[in-house]
Amino acid sequence: MKKITLLLFFYSILSCGVKQSTNQLNSGNYDEAINIAVNSLRNNKNAKGKQDYVYILEEAFAKAKERDLRNIDSWSKDANPTNLEQIYNSYVQLNRRQELIRPLLPLKLLKEGRDAIFPMDNYSTEIIDSKNALSNYLYTN
C-alpha cells in the first residue's frame, strides 16, 4: 500500500510539472517553459516518461527565438538609440538560452524516431556590436 501511494505521489508531481510547463508555453512565457523542461530533463533525458518535456522544449525554444529575433529586427529598423539596450539584452538572452540547452543535446523524440531540432546560431558578433553601440550611446549622452 505504501508503494502504491508513493508511486501515485510521484506520478502526480511529474504530471503537474508537464502541465505547468505547458501552461507557461501556452501563455507566452517561453523562457519559464524552457527552464522547467531543462530542469526536468537533466536526469535521464531519454526516458520515455520525459518525452513531453522534449516536445515542450523544442516548441518553446523555437517560439522564443522567433519572438526575440522579430523584436530585434523591429528595434533595429526603428533606429532609436534608446532601443540599443533592449537589442543587447535580447542577444544575450538568445545566447543564454542556447547555452542552457546545449548540454542536453541530442534529445530524442522517440515517437517520431528523430532528434529534436534546436538550430544554434553564433551571436557573439551581434552581442559585441550591440554592446559597443550601447556603450557609445551611453558615453555620448
Predicted regions and their residues:
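Post-signal peptide N-terminal segment of secreted/secretory-pathway proteins
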Residues: 41, 45-141
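Bacterial Sec signal peptide processing site at the extreme N-terminus
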Residues: 10-34
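Alpha-helical solenoid repeat scaffolds, predominantly canonical TPR units
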Residues: 24, 36, 87-90
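Positively charged n-region of N-terminal signal peptides that target proteins for export
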Residues: 1-4
